[in-house]
Amino acid sequence: MKAVYPGSFDPITLGHVDIIKRALSIFDELVVLVTENPRKKCMFTLEERKKLIEEVLSDLSGVKVDVHHGLLVDYLKKHGIKVLVRGLRAVTDYEYELQMALANKKLYSDLETVFLIASEKFSFISSSLVKEVALYGGDVTEWVPPEVARALNEKLKEGKR
């Protein structure tokens, strides 16, 4: 069975990688779908995020990285995918994700959303936190893959925030 794990992944963190690996133990195929979130200002472009994720996940089989502009359910319907994977770090994530799952179900009745609880050691990590700490010169190497740490340093040297 194929599932999609969508997100802005700006940048991908070890928490995301943990969810991806755990989802791959459940599903035969997983599409990591890089999406635009109009409420977020991204440091990396869609294509940069896609390339970075492909580098990070290059040793995993059964995973594909794709990008999508627009409604998530349109992508799912177009590709015949009926399972959505979401990671939950806290109760506040659950409230938002439940609303999104219900809205997506209304738009695509065949869709099922599977929630994976974040591993405790990654439960506090978010892409926003990573960017903020990196911006102020903090060490984020325990929170992101090495490829991401390098890319963050390069972006910050360029003056992109």
Swiss-Prot record:
Its main location: cytoplasm. Keywords: ATP-binding, Coenzyme A biosynthesis, Cytoplasm, Magnesium, Nucleotide-binding, Nucleotidyltransferase, Transferase. Pathway: Cofactor biosynthesis; coenzyme A biosynthesis; CoA from (R)-pantothenate: step 4/5. GO terms for cellular component: cytoplasm. Substrate binds at residues 8, 40, 72, 86. Gene3D superfamilies: HUPs. The record marks 16 as: Transition state stabilizer. One of its GO terms (molecular function) is pantetheine-phosphate adenylyltransferase activity. The keyword Lyase does not apply. GO terms for biological process: coenzyme A biosynthetic process. SUPFAM superfamilies: Nucleotidylyl transferase. Its EC number is 2.7.7.3. Disulfide bonds: none annotated. Its cofactor is Mg(2+). ATP binds at residues 8-9, 16, 87-89, 97, 122-128. It is found in: Cytoplasm. It catalyses: (R)-4'-phosphopantetheine + ATP + H(+) = 3'-dephospho-CoA + diphosphate. HAMAP family: PPAT_bact. Reversibly transfers an adenylyl group from ATP to 4'-phosphopantetheine, yielding dephospho-CoA (dPCoA) and pyrophosphate. Belongs to the bacterial CoaD family. Homohexamer. This is Phosphopantetheine adenylyltransferase. The lineage of its organism: Bacteria, Thermotogati, Thermotogota, Thermotogae, Thermotogales.
